[in-house]
Swiss-Prot record:
PANTHER family: METHYLTRANSFERASE, RIBOSOMAL RNA LARGE SUBUNIT METHYLTRANSFERASE H. GO terms for molecular function: rRNA (pseudouridine-N3-)-methyltransferase activity. The keyword Electron transport does not apply. S-adenosyl-L-methionine binds at L77, G109, F128, S129, R130, L131, T132, F133. This is Ribosomal RNA large subunit methyltransferase H. It comes from Desulfitobacterium hafniense (strain DSM 10664 / DCB-2). Transmembrane segments: none annotated. Homodimer. It is found in: Cytoplasm. Belongs to the RNA methyltransferase RlmH family. Specifically methylates the pseudouridine at position 1915 (m3Psi1915) in 23S rRNA. Its main location: cytoplasm. It catalyses: pseudouridine(1915) in 23S rRNA + S-adenosyl-L-methionine = N(3)-methylpseudouridine(1915) in 23S rRNA + S-adenosyl-L-homocysteine + H(+).
Amino acid sequence: MLQIKIVAVGKIRERFLMEGIKEYAKRLSAYIRLEMTEIADEPCPERLSAADEERVKDREGERLLKGIGPQEHVILLDLQGKEFTSPDFSEYMDELALMGKSSVTFIIGGSLGVSGEVRKRADYRWSFSRLTFPHPLMRLMLLEQIYRAMRISKGEPYHK
């Protein structure tokens, strides 16, 4: 069974998001082993110098990369990444399985983005859209898309 890890900066505080995440985690349990890890975000004041922003991203980046093994396929959620349609994402996940990838890790960075080291470690950079979304909401959206991909892959009905 495919192992999927989601490693994200910050804590989810909104109850409605936590409930949605729990629901999709439950649905996904029939298809994958899911592990979700929250990484503490760096405290930062409103205004930071460019150097301070880089320091924050570097510290968060170190924590993001800490638990990722060398064999894991890493997908970074990134505004500058490439977009998928849902069927294309499902096909991509199927291709990873055919290539023998048994562990896929998705990274969701902090509010300032991610460090260069995290970008370098990514095997694929995926953009959901050119729009910016709240990071806690991205976790729910990601789980929904993974669930949709699994349903598509198995030929099971899923609304379009």
